[in-house]
Amino acid sequence: MAKTSKIVQSQRASKFKVQHHNRCSRCGRPRGYINRFGLCRICFRELALQGQIPGVRKSSW
């Protein structure tokens, strides 16, 4: 889990646009962010395997 202070800090509007860093909306993780879903790769995988993200399923070929 991310530090609570970092999560709160990222929710505030930053002074400059380049200072903004995307964070997972579920756990607050700053790395591995998937922009389309607003989640990090770990949370995305958990929710996708549970079937909670509509239109997403595990690929197989």
Swiss-Prot record:
InterPro entries: Ribosomal_uS14, Ribosomal_uS14_bact, Ribosomal_uS14_CS, Ribosomal_uS14_sf
GO BP field: translation
Gene Ontology cellular-component annotations: cytoplasm; small ribosomal subunit
Metal-binding keyword on record: yes
Disulphide-bonded residues: none
Residues involved in Zn(2+) binding: C24, C27, C40, C43
Cofactor requirement: Zn(2+)
Function as written in the Swiss-Prot or TrEMBL entry: Binds 16S rRNA, required for the assembly of 30S particles and may also be responsible for determining the conformation of the 16S rRNA at the A site.
UniProt-listed PANTHER family: 30S RIBOSOMAL PROTEIN S14, SMALL RIBOSOMAL SUBUNIT PROTEIN US14M
Protein name as catalogued: Small ribosomal subunit protein uS14
Source organism of the structure: Dehalococcoides mccartyi (strain ATCC BAA-2100 / JCM 16839 / KCTC 5957 / BAV1)
